């Protein structure tokens, strides 16, 4: 059964359905990002959360990814991480919790892996509190 989040937007049932709906140019870009994240954290589980593919580890969200009309985004869900990598992220549009990049030009794999690993450390630190 399809879940709806509003009258006009159907939430994808799973990550594969999300990718099937994405236009090809964005899908290719997002698949590269997805592959990099999987390599950085192979034990992560992919789910749909807030209508986007989300990588979770130990039931805690690490990062979300999304495709939009003219760009793709990586959502580290952490302003602290964006500040920590501010210099490396300078070529990209960033906001409070988003790294936006053009279609066909994903964020370098080494930087994505740093962000993901930093999110793992953040989640582990929160768990200890």
Give a label for each model feature.
Residues 1-129:
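Charge-dense, helix-prone N-terminal extensions
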